[in-house]
């Protein structure tokens, strides 16, 4: 490929046995057994076990390497013995016998967090040293998953006839659900641009211009208080518009997009509802679940028992009913004659 590597580590397998190659990456960890030194080399795709014995002129220098040193290694691919095969790695059937190496960049002696561990270092440390945090296997998996999902969404929308069109980032303020982030203009003193809370007006201009189906993975900026489940300030949303479409057309596209995406990327132990997804009116949702975003994994439903309290003489209920309130209860399953506590709900 180039002077730094001939292959990505994920592409190294038993087909390359006896071949001499060059690879580059980070030292994930090393193990000195006295007569043998094992190095787990890591790149963005996988790990490769490299080995050198104490008869090699490189042994002493390689014994000094540290985790996260960046290194280029030249050597011969050899087959592992049956008992040392690692079936969890693409390269687990082979190892690289080191013949030469070059340290491309040395790591400091102590790291604020260990890249090769799953220890919880706390959000403050992880965000301060984000470039190290993102090297960790879990975070690498997450950012690759995000990339794969975005590419899948783009492919789905293109197959459905949608065009991906960009909208301006520096724009004028428009009323939305939060406050705007403002950017001062260098040219027009005292004037400000607003970052879009959503591409609403511009996408509608696209539709008025004759675009039939529009979508965008759009950055949105909202100056609002942080929440436990949402990063403050900015987020990305799948934004879409359709011309000459009914509500059923839109629900159909969104349902299939969600189903296909989750069906492809969910873990094996998870399951999702088959299409069509159940639909509820706002009124039905409030009456049956008490909210407009119900968790359908919970089988319990609210029951309207208002009529049983009308004229019952229980003033606390009758006064509320006169003001338009409803009395709801939860019917616990198979609870007759048994004590019930909150833990059962």
Predicted regions and their residues:
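Class II aminoacyl-tRNA synthetase catalytic cores and aaRS-like
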Residues: 1-342
């Amino acid at each position: 490929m180039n002077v730094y590597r001939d292959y990505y580590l994920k592409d190294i397998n038993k087909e390359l046995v006896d071949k001499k190659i060059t690879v580059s990456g980070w030292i994930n960890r090393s193990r000195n057994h006295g007569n043998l030194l094992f190095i787990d080399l890591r790149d963005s795709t996988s790990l490769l076990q490299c080995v050198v014995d104490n008869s090699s002129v490189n042994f002493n220098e390689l014994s000094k390497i540290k985790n996260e040193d960046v290194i280029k290694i030249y050597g011969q691919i050899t087959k592992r013995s049956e008992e040392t095969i690692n079936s969890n790695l693409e390269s687990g059937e082979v190892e690289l016998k080191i013949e030469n190496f070059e340290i491309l960049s040395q790591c400091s002696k102590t790291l604020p967090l260990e890249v090769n561990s799953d220890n919880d270092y706390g959000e403050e440390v992880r965000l301060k040293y984000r470039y190290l945090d993102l090297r960790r296997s879990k975070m690498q998996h997450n950012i690759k998953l995000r990339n794969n999902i975005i590419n899948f969404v783009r492919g789905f929308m293109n197959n459905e006839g949608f065009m991906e069109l960009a909208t301006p980032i520096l724009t004028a303020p428009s009323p939305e659900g939060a406050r705007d982030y403002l950017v001062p203009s260098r040219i027009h003193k005292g004037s400000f641009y607003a970052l879009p809370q959503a591409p609403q007006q511009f996408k509608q201009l696209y539709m008025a211009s004759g675009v039939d189906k529009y979508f965008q993975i759009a950055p949105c900026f909202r100056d609002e208080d942080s929440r436990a489940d949402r990063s403050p300030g900015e987020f990305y949303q799948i934004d879409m518009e359709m011309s000459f479409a009914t509500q059923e057309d839109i629900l159909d596209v969104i349902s299939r997009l969600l189903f296909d995406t989750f069906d492809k990327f969910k873990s094996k132990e998870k399951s999702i509802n088959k299409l069509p997804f159940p639909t509820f009116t706002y009124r039905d949702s409030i009456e049956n679940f008490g909210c407009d975003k119900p968790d359908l994994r919970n089988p319990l439903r609210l029951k309207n028992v208002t009529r049983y309290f009308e004229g019952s003489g229980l003033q606390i209920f009758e006064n509320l009913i006169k003001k338009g309130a409803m009395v709801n209860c939860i019917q616990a399953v198979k609870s007759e004659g048994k004590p019930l506590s909150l833990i059962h709900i």
